[in-house]
Amino acid sequence: IEPIISCGGQVELPKGFLQSSYNYIRKAGGVCVSDEVQVGFGRLGKSYWGFELHDVIPDIITIGKPFGNGHPIGAVVCSEEIANKFANGMEFFNTFGGNPVSCSIATEVLSFIERNNLQKNALLTGGYLKKELIKLEKKYPIIGQVRGEGFFLGIELTDNELNPLEEHANYLTNRMREFGIFMSTDGPDGNVIKIKPPIIFNKEDCDKLILYLDKIFDEDFMKFY
């Protein structure tokens, strides 16, 4: 499970949910897997890995995407207990596993994140961005909720009865494209604007994003009532 549900609409898990889930899974003999593909590598700001937000330790962690900063690479990290299960003669084989170019790039990505304090940037600049988005939420009734952590944020668009406004979400993303800003939607109803910029995003970038969001939210089409 993802520590913050991404394609489900940037949904933050209730406090204690993951701890309780892990307990039930382990009592049933299962293993706990944390999908860190989207939320990992400091993007959430408060922690390097998403599972750390919930005070749990998974048995398996899956990582990818930002690991190579555009270059294809993924990895699975597991506990020693699970790794030892492969010591019985069973062998895992992957034709492209351990590719030296991919591994070299991933190593540099990890170093770059650390050298440039990008987790701290996600915390501080992402926090600033969320505060500015909440200001828009108070200004425009169409914004049902702003949620997320660091540079992993979502804006849910709803009417006064909390009905999802997918058409308005699509309108907004297409209008933003006209200003050179590429965004997309998530969630089962397609009404959540996802905001996941590169974690080198700075305050000036945030201000530009807010400027155009404010402009579009003020357009007649976005006034649903």
Identify what each model region corresponds to.
Residues 1-225:
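Conserved N-terminal phosphate-binding loop of PLP-dependent enzymes in the Aspartate aminotransferase
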